[in-house]
């Protein structure tokens, strides 16, 4: 259901390369001026011109603490991506705030509902968002039903057992809404399910399969060396096993790598030399080499995509919960001094073909 030409999707090409640009609107409002080769540049256009074909964006239900990642902000982001010639992956968090492989806090409006009520709410919300995007001419090409759903959807936490009857009901409700919207609006939309860190993929999808979660097109994996026990070879083995066992495409849908240990502000950075992989120095060249080798690993093992997380989360005067600036500026794809596009963007334009095993 995926095609390398934007915005419509058709047959699957060898590879999707892209980035999550959920921060761009906010960074620009905070005063960030992005450059490419020293000239003013739009990050969406930079992504496209360097060889990318897909943009990912997150959506929160009712984030009263911010005006970003709301429906209106996401509509603006998707519109910018499509205008730049990019396809769009819409990431439903099904939450009012960040959810990830540690926690899946439900939206406040759904927190006290029983499973049947939550399934209806999740289905209807998903369908409503997609119907509104269709009316605006901005349907995404791919939809994530949940973000890093290692714990149970709508309430689970790391280490807690998953009630798979409930979890399957919720996941299938979201999947059904995407399928219905796709049919109603006459546009193919691929469904992705997303798990953090490769070591968790096979156990989770085995459980999901046994519980009847079967109707999806893409397996998305977050891969960060800081939080994974696996090197690139280990990641490759998981990708190979997953696409063979489940018959789905497999993407590394989140990844990043630091290019410096320097700080541009007082926020503690999440990545750096403490999470570097052997052979990949924390430098602009090391960042580029990591992305090239990661993508080659994906391709060699039958995978279909790599998406960089938050290349646009640069340091600005704005405050976050963690301090002024960014916790990621040293792992962005724009430099700290001038927000000029880094050499790592060239990873997007390289030709990748599977190597014989």
Q: Locations of the language-model features?
A:
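Acidic (Asp/Glu)-rich catalytic clusters
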Residues: 12-13, 42-51, 76-87, 131-139, ...
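Active-site cleft segment of glycoside hydrolase catalytic domains centered on the general acid/base Glu
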Residues: 70-73, 100-210, 214-216, 228-237, ...
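Conserved, mostly hydrophobic/aromatic
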Residues: 19, 47, 91, 143, ...
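N-terminal signal peptide c-region/cleavage motif recognized by signal peptidases
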Residues: 3-7
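N-terminal substrate-binding region of glycoside hydrolase catalytic domains
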Residues: 12-87, 93-122, 220
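Glycoside hydrolase catalytic-domain groove-lining segments
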Residues: 43-45, 180-190, 199-275, 292-300
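Active-site beta-loop-alpha junctions enriched in small/polar residues
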Residues: 22-24, 60-62, 93-97, 145-150, ...
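Aromatic-rich peripheral "rim/lid" segments of glycoside hydrolase catalytic domains that contact
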Residues: 29-35, 241, 260-293, 297-302, ...
């Amino acid at each position: 259901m995926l095609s390398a030409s934007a915005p419509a999707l058709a047959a699957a090409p060898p590879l999707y390369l892209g980035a999550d640009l959920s921060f761009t609107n906010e960074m620009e409002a905070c005063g960030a001026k992005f450059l490419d080769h020293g000239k003013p540049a739009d990050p969406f256009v930079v992504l496209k011109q360097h060889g990318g074909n897909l943009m990912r964006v997150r959506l929160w239900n009712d984030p009263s603490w911010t005006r970003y990642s709301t429906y209106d902000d996401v509509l603006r982001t998707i519109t910018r991506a499509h205008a730049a010639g990019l396809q769009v992956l819409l990431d439903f968090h099904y939450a009012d705030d960040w959810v990830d492989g540690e926690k899946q806090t439900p939206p406040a409006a759904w927190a006290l509902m029983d499973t049947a009520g939550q399934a209806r709410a999740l289905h209807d919300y998903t369908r409503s968002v997609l119907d509104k995007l269709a009316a605006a001419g901005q349907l995404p090409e791919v939809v994530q039903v949940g973000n890093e759903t290692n714990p149970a959807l709508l309430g689970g936490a790391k280490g807690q057992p998953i009630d798979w009857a409930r979890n399957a009901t919720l996941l299938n409700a979201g999947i059904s809404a995407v399928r219905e919207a796709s049919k109603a609006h006459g546009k193919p939309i691929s469904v992705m399910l997303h798990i953090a860190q490769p070591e968790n993929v096979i156990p989770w999808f085995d459980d999901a399969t046994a519980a009847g979660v079967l109707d999806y097109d893409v397996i998305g994996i977050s891969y960060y060396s800081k939080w994974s026990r696996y090197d690139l070879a280990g990641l490759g083995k998981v990708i190979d096993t997953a696409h063979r066992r489940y018959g789905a495409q497999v993407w590394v849908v989140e990844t990043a790598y630091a290019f410096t240990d320097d700080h541009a502000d007082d926020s503690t950075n999440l990545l750096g030399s403490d999470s570097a992989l052997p052979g990949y120095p924390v430098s602009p060249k090391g960042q580029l080499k990591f992305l090239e080798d990661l993508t080659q690993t994906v391709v060699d093992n039958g995978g279909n995509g790599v998406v960089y997380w938050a290349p646009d989360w640069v340091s600005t005067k704005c405050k976050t919960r963690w301090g002024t600036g960014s916790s990621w500026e040293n792992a962005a794809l724009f430099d700290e001094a001038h927000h000029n596009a880094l050499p790592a963007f060239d990873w997007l334009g390289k030709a990748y073909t599977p190597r014989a095993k």
